[in-house]
């Protein structure tokens, strides 16, 4: 379900907002989509807990689902920031990330973050997907 809260025809929220959180899954601002921190969830919005590889791939799929309503895919991602619970997982995370991101050309930052709760990983993203003509 897509809950679009509009400020204008080119600036609006994307995705169903959790009523307990003060932000939306993503926000469109012109030709860019800013994706809030996402964690590994399945299609039914249930948390996935597994290896760093499983959680990395699941988090990328979560991002893909968030941006799909705007016609965007992971190949449209231009920047990802990853928050790892433990940087000792970096090598395994990096391998899974490369597998999951495909041929996207992007910038990336990865940092250790102890505030990541009940998961090994969280990612936010910036997506470039021009608005269709006439919007």
Regions found by a protein language model. Give the residues of each.
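N-terminal presequence-like segments and the immediate start of the first folded domain
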Residues: 1-61, 65-78, 84-135
């Amino acid at each position: 379900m897509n809950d679009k809260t509009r400020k204008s025809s080119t600036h609006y929220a994307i995705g169903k907002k959790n009523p307990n959180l003060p932000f939306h899954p993503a926000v469109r601002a012109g030709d860019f989509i800013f994706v809030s921190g996402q964690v590994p969830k399945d299609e039914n919005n249930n948390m996935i807990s597994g290896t760093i590889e499983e959680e990395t791939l699941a988090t990328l799929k979560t991002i893909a689902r968030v941006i799909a309503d705007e016609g965007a895919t992971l190949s449209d991602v231009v920047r990802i920031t990853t928050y790892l619970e433990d940087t000792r997982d970096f090598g395994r995370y990096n391998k899974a990330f490369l597998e999951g991101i495909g041929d996207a050309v992007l910038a990336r930052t990865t940092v250790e973050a102890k505030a990541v709760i009940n998961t090994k990983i969280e990612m936010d993203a910036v997506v470039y997907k021009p608005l269709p003509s006439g919007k």
